[in-house]
Amino acid sequence: MQLSEIGGHLTARTGIDDLMEDLFKALHSEEAGLCQLNGGSPAVIPEVTELWRRSMAELVRNGKFDVLVGHYAHPGGDPRFIRALVRFLNERCGWNLKPENVAITQGGQMACFTLFNMLAGPCKDGCVREILFPLCPDYVGYQSQSLCGGVMFRGIRPGIRMLDAHTFKYVIDFDRLDIRPETAAVCMSRPTNPTGNVVTDEELDRLREMTARAGVPLMIDNAYGPPLPNICFVPVKPAWDENMILTMSLSKIGLPGTRTGIVIARPDIIRAVVSMVTTSSLCPNNLGQALVTPYLEDGTLERVCRETLTPFYRRQAEFALALLPELFGESIPWRVHKSEGAMFLWLWFEGLPITCQELYERCKARGCFVNPGYHFFFALPEEEDQPWPHRHECIRISFTQTEDLLRKGLSIVADEVKKAYSHS
């Protein structure tokens, strides 16, 4: 098969391909005892799942299910869901949104794909416009979303702040950060996937000032952030203005299978997003919107996130963090990024004698799936690879699994890391 240039970009093997295949294998394999410590699949929390069971039963009972699956939805999203979301965000965040500020897509991944290729890439004037990531590493799912290849993305290496002997935090290096004439937008996830980092309110305010002054939008991937699902372990102030594009998702509230993404932006951007949704898929999936709307309207969703979802992930993070000194000890140079949100730990093994890709392969051979960290540095120039080994020394761990599987999986990782250092 002969692929077009765009086909070549979209089918190139990247980290997200391995991630999704490993995720499916670990979750659905008949092989017992596999440790799925990769991927962003949320935990199955009974109290949350019960909400969706009740909502689905009501849709079947009142006859709305037939319309839900038998008719196309509006290409911009379900009007009732959008009205409920706008009302909720305005009340909780003090914003002044209108329905014209919201569009629904087939998941947060598709929202970012649409926005990236709508704003950046080759332009009529011959310029290739870029998406700038002010703090790398960032979400591996962005890596293959460009229709013109890696030229669309540029990233900034972070500053590393040591907090104690085994804990560090990435910070934006504003001395390195430059918004250029070809910069189409500045983008980051907050809380950050893969590290669990939360860019501080002060850093965010500075980014907002810089992007507003440059006349380019600031995109925030809010898949884990406030006010929903609010998987944050430090205070985080929700932020939006007309120079910002905020993306959200229903995945992390327990509905990844419904593929429901949300874009919040000024009306001209929303109209363009809706046009691209219509062209690419006619309309977004309406199941997730229908399941969630009643709980948005009556406050149940916010309460369950506050009382059940966020505390669950905080406990999981604390349990996983407590395992690290026990399993890794003091014989090897291990560090973990400060866990401030999301559902991951980001481990750094300074001077690791093997690459993180080889560590991933060794763990996988023993039934433990992790994510090699170098994929998350996709936006950094290749020429920086040699002088900065850090990006080959990190792995991402998901802590959504049971305590037994977390202990088993992290024990495998610790064993393989110790072997690597001892054989160097």
Spans of features found by a protein language model:
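N-terminal "arm"/small-domain region of PLP-dependent enzymes with the aminotransferase-like
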Residues: 1-76, 80, 87-91, 181-182, ...
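Conserved core segment of the aminotransferase class I/II
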Residues: 127-131, 146-147, 156-162, 240-314, ...
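Conserved PLP-binding catalytic core of the aspartate aminotransferase-like
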Residues: 332-367, 375
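Conserved glycine-rich beta-strand-loop-beta hairpin in the small C-terminal domain of fold type I
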Residues: 36, 307-321, 333-348
